[in-house]
Structure formats: structure tokens, C-alpha cells
Amino acid sequence: MKLVDLTADLQALLASPNVHHNLSAPKLTEKVISRNEGTLTSTGAVRATTGAYTGRSPKDKFIVREQSTENQIDWGAVNQPISEEAFEKLYAKVVSYLKQRDELFVFEGFAGADEKYRLPITVVNEFAWHNLFARQLFIRPETDERDTQAQPFTILSAPHFKADPETDGTHSETFIIVSFEKRVILIGGTEYAGEMKKSIFSIMNFLLPQQDILPMHCSANVGEKGDVALFFGLSGTGKTTLSADADRKLIGDDEHGWSDSGVFNIEGGCYAKCINLSEEKEPQIFRAIRFGSVLENVVLDEKTGEADYDNSFYTENTRAAYPIEMIGNIVQPSIAGHPQAIVFLTADAFGVLPPISKLTKEQAMYHFLSGYTSKLAGTERGVTSPQTTFSTCFGSPFLPLPAHVYAEMLGHKIDEHGVQVFLVNTGWTGGGYGVGERMKLSYTRAMVKAAIEGRLNQTDMTADSIFGLRSPVHVPGVPDEVLQPENTWSDKQAYNEKALFLANEFKENFKKFSHADSIAKAGGPLV
């Protein structure tokens, strides 16, 4: 199928009389209720459930193998290839399916808060609540801002359309397929709205480096003096909690680009985890869940419509989507200067990484490529033991290009702008999980505050002999003995054994980066 034919099909679909273009949040909310797609909560938010899929489906994600991009993609388990022929057949089926719907909902907006680098996007939805999600998550145009000269990336979302693996070349009835050449994303067989968000992020992770912009899976905030801080970290490391700071304004909570001008948010909204949410712990998120926001897979009280955030009946991965303006203390537009500090967050359940370390450029590249944290997994007898988790660049599922591309860009920008980089362990101290205790949040906040305010740039440091990490000997508000993990363990031999174990885990994981020997030697464990 030629691009001109595909474009004509798409234009015909968008011109259909059953298509609603750019409905407001109130109108979309009306549609959600009248179409029985969801219910209103006691605060006026829309609540929808997603059926069998309550999270992303990475094994069902494909990139079309096309001549123009074939040699750029890092093909493998994350970026699975699918043929152009299979894509075109499935595209025709999805378009035909959507044409037969009674109603369709279209959002036309952008990804990228910096006007110089933003990407026009068109989202075509079978569900009204999905369109409300897209409207609140991406960047909404002010008046008629869309540049008609730039061809948008188009998402065709058909949750009730199911693929046939035998004839369609998919692994299951579910599919998320990206064609960079055709600028189309097909999503079918899943009602999980997060697939739309992360598909656009994957697109930006491919396009932005071509403009010498580093795409990043991180949160970002800025102080009164314009000092920008970035926070990288996998789930459970405290990224959301630590980047929400009353003394600093939020740039964005999840996806950013770093250009020659500075940092910009890729999105116009937030997609926050809701499990165990409370007004006391996270007041900004709690108060943002009101009319215009979307709750996904959250249990409601049948009589009152109140959300039960502690209930994981549908999934632990309960979510809220809302425009960033719904929380206070933000930067508008979501753009700021170059970062002064970068914080890599890890929750080390083995209790051997220092609570805070200042990294060299090579160590920063090493830990960026590693993307380490640990998770607690239950065993048959109910005992939990830590497991190492590594996610390249803290965002492995969303990286179409080889990892070294992103790491080298980071190293260059650290050099160019003199950025201070810190590794912060929000995990265990005084022993591993089951022996020690979780690092006190007040200590972590004090360390992060000192780091991003530049108060650790000239302080005395001491280096450990296993990881080669340099830690401050003193941080205001934190007991000195806590800063050196070995000192908090009563059994020094046990500490040494566990530290050597984790160092070896790092080295084993890093073997997949065959191109990065120099980084491993200069930035990895010493043993």
C-alpha cells in the first residue's frame, strides 16, 4: 500500500459523519456516561475498567520492518519486527472496523511542550473515555494551533477489534504496531489506555535523537532560581514522591526531552499510580482527581461513588489521568533550562548501596545504562526475597534505538553543561530486607535537597572499595553513620558478601552492552 493510499483511507475515515472531533472534557464525559463506558466518581472524575488487560502488553508490541528505518532499530525482544505486508493488511482491517462504528472520537494535539520540537498527533478512538484520556494526557492546542504542513503521527485505537494471530502475524488477539514510515500506530485487542501514552513516548524516543535531543523517562522540577533537577527511577523508588516538592515547581512527572535550549515536558498531563493513594501522602495527586480526570481500574463504593484506593480488586496498577494544570505549583508552559542536577533513584533491598553517591560522568553513563532497582517477590512459603531488576536507561520497553545512543547523548550533555549526577538509594539500611529497615523518607529528602541545591559539590567524600562510589561524609539532617552502609550492618562479613553479590549482578547485566567496555571499566564496580 502506497503512503498516498493509506493517507486517503485515513482522511476518508476522519471525514465520516459519525466522527466527533476535539470534543471538550464535559462533552466527552457526557458521551462516556450515555454510552455506558464508565461511571462518575464522587469527585466528578470518570472511572473506567479495562477488562483482561490492566497493564501494557509488551509481547504484543511490534515495529514495522521498513527500509527507511531498518538499520536504525535495535531489533529484539523489546522491538519485535513485523512485515510491511502484515501491517498493511491489519491496517485495512482496522480502518474498515472503525468505519462501521456508530461513533468515533478524534483528538488532535501535540507531543512536546517546546514548540520547536513538538510532534503533531491525531488520536482516533473507539471509546469516548480513551479520547478523554488522550485529551488530558497529551498537549491540547490553544485555539487552532495545528500546523497543517506537518504530517501527524496517528493512533488508531480499536480495543474491541481482535487480531487473528494465524493470518495477521501477531502473537495474540492484541497488538500495538508502530510504522515510522507511514506515521501510524495501530492498537487493538486491549482497553488499557496506557498503551497510547507509551506508544507516543516510544515514537519520541526514536525521533528526538535525530534532532540531537535526549528523550528521558524521568520527572523534572525547577527551583526559584531556575535550577532544574531530573529524577530517574523505576517503579517503587520514590520518583513521584521526591519530585513533588513544595519549594519547587513541577515541569513534568514522567517524560521529557533535553535539547540545546533545556528541558521540556513531552506531555500535557500526568498518569499517576493510585494504589494506596491518600490525601495525606500525596495531596497534589489526590486533589487532581476531579471532574475532567480519568480513573482506570479503581474500585468505587457502589452507594457513594467514592474511590477505594487501597483496594486492588482489578489490579495493583490503578491509575489516574489528568491535565498537569490540575495540580498546583507547576511551570507553564512545561519548559525550563538545562539541569544542574540529575538524581538516579534505586530501591536497593540488599541494603549495600550508599544512600547517596556523587557520580563521575562514566559512572553516570554506567548506572544510566544499568537502570537498577530491586523488587520483592513472594515465594511459595510466603517469604519474600529481593530480586535484582535492570531496565536500560530506566525505560527499556520504550527505546527503539540501541541503548548506547541514549547513554552517549547523556554523557555529552553532562560534560557540556557541567551537570552533577547522584545515585540515591531509597531502599534498605542496616541490613537487607528482613534484617534492616527502609531508609527514612526524611533522610532521603534531606540528601536530595542538599544534592539539587549544590551543597554536596564541595563536601568531603569517601569511596567504597566494591562499587567505587563516592559518598559524602556529612549531609545536614542525616546521621553520619547512615551515609556509609557498611557501618550500619552489625555483621560486616555479611555486608561484604551481599555487596559482592550485587556487584556481580551489575557486571553480568552489563555484558549485553558489548560496545560499552570503556564505560564498564571506568564506571562499574571495582571488583
From Swiss-Prot:
What role does this protein play?
A: Involved in the gluconeogenesis. Catalyzes the conversion of oxaloacetate (OAA) to phosphoenolpyruvate (PEP) through direct phosphoryl transfer between the nucleoside triphosphate and OAA.
Q: What is its EC number?
A: 4.1.1.49
Q: Which molecular function terms from Gene Ontology are attached?
A: ATP binding; metal ion binding; phosphoenolpyruvate carboxykinase (ATP) activity
Q: Does the keyword Protease apply?
A: no
- Residue positions annotated to bind ATP are 198, 217, 233-241, 282, 319, 444
Q: Where mainly found?
A: cytoplasm
Which NCBIfam families did the record assign?
pckA (TIGR00224), PRK09344.1-2 (NF006820), PRK09344.1-3 (NF006821)
- UniProt name for this protein: Phosphoenolpyruvate carboxykinase (ATP)
Please give the GO cellular component terms listed in this UniProt entry.
cytosol
Q: Cofactor note from UniProt? A: Binds 1 Mn(2+) ion per subunit.
Q: Which GO terms describe its biological process?
A: gluconeogenesis
Gene3D superfamilies, sorted:
3.90.228.20, Phosphoenolpyruvate Carboxykinase, domain 1, Phosphoenolpyruvate Carboxykinase, domain 2
Task: Cite the binding residues for Mn(2+).
Answer: 198, 217, 254
> Where is substrate bound in this sequence?
56, 192, 198, 319
Q: Give the residues annotated as coiled coil.
A: none
- UniProt keyword list: ATP-binding, Cytoplasm, Decarboxylase, Gluconeogenesis, Lyase, Manganese, Metal-binding, Nucleotide-binding
Query: What does the record give as cofactor?
Result: Mn(2+)
Q: What does the similarity note say?
A: Belongs to the phosphoenolpyruvate carboxykinase (ATP) family.
Reactions the enzyme catalyzes = oxaloacetate + ATP = phosphoenolpyruvate + ADP + CO2
**Compartments, record wording:** Cytoplasm
Pathway given in the UniProt record: Carbohydrate biosynthesis; gluconeogenesis
What enzyme category does the UniProt record give?
lyase
Keyword DNA-binding on entry: no
